[in-house]
Amino acid sequence: MNMNSTDFACLVTKFLTEYLPHHRCYSKNTILSYRDTLKLFLRFLKEEKDISPNSIYIKDFKRELVIEFLEWYRNSGASISAANQRLAALKTFSDYAQLESIEYIAPLQSVSNIKAKKSSPKEVSFLTASQMSKLINRPDINTYTGFRHRVILTLMYDSGCRVQELCDITIADISLGSITTLRLHGKGNKYRTIVLSDATSKLIENYISRYRSYAVGTDYLITNRYHQKIDRDGISYIVKKYVDDIRKEDTAFPEHVHCHMFRHSKAMHMLEAGINVVYIRDFLGHEDISTTMVYVRADNRLKNEAINALAPKITNEVNLPDWNKDKDLLEFLNSLK
């Protein structure tokens, strides 16, 4: 740490490198999500307050500032639940800072006491099967970059993995064969093994033989253009690139497609195919089936909309008389006041 670092910078460093991993025993992925929240907070300070990361002190970390950050984040298009997750991370940091900077315990406690906003039942955003197919097949597999991007999009959908799980896949996690399996390192440091489709298996086999034949088991399956481990921002960029490309030709294609939407789409398509919700729970790596039930509710809502859409057609098929043809009756009805 630089000798000129502020107390805020020092606390952030200790929070991420000591407190979370060693005292709270949080997983690497959880720590990364906390890091991302703090990066967003610093970006907010720079863009909205013209405060550089090197100029903020722990005494400046106040309730009003955090609330402004959350409003800025919501205005960027984030959901209430996403904002609540960011708030939870900042409150954990505030709790830690109280232990280290007791002289600022009062303003820090006011941050910890910010209440999360209540959100309506979560709406599941997903692509239809045809939309997903269009997106996955967009990259040009005749180039190395396009082939790599095709693998990323295909694997993210077919495995239903979280984006960080995709980043963490190593060569050893893939077991190619008549039935190809993939081992995923999920939340809570838990692993699950899933079966991939034959088409995805063939794509990965070709990708490894063409571009990753030199790789050993501990090497990452997906790398960035610098042949380093790809990160979540890199995958988000790839998704946006092809969505924007499609929308140049098809403005009806959804504009806001995020990485987690691949996971939502896979779950919805499995449900539509009649796959048991318990299997979907295990496939997605949900600890509690209530988390998976959000897809069941969404599927029921779609079915209800389909039924309602058919209702006018059924009514229109009934041979009701055309009262306009009976001028006398129409005049009589119009004369009633």
Describe the role of every protein-language-model region.
Residues 1-337:
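Conserved catalytic core of the tyrosine transesterase superfamily
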